[in-house]
Amino acid sequence: MGSSGIFGWIKRIRLLPPRDQEFFGLMEKLVDTAAEASQWLTEMFNGDPRRGQEFSTRIENCLTKCSQIEESIEGLLLRSQQPPFARNEIGTFSTDILRIAKFINHASNRYVIYDIPSSDKEMRELGTIIKEACDQIVEAVKSLRSNRNIEPVARAVDRLETKADEIYHGGLRRRFQEIRSDRSILDLRALG
């Protein structure tokens, strides 16, 4: 065996076990489920208000599934020899995605509990932005197997978050203006 044969043999020896690929499948399921919940929220805000409870139940089912997947990721983190990323990064990621699903569930739950007769412009716009952000996250997670650069997607999600903040604050401003206007009308009626 020549020197190139020995070096070739040494190069084929793996000193560390392969990175655990099971994480990618679980992370993809997690973000797909959160994206599904965001799709139901968008349909809830754009559809027939009488179907609110139906959409809310579907979103709650997505939240339950996200919670179960997040628990599976936590369990895998405990027993995995070599996860594809730092353990704390994976744990933070799964917790953050679960938090997104909880936020979506909370929004749908309030829509049903308060028996909102129809969604307003801001609700529909925010629903669309939440869906876009979830789709960006799905795209980023699916690319992680081959490309670790998720920076462009993170920037896109940040832009969507900024846009959502602007819509939210614009909606609040409009609401308070409506309240002031209604009070002024009531005050004029009381005087007149």
Regions found by a protein language model. Give the residues of each.
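Cytosolic, long alpha-helical scaffolding segments
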Residues: M1-G192
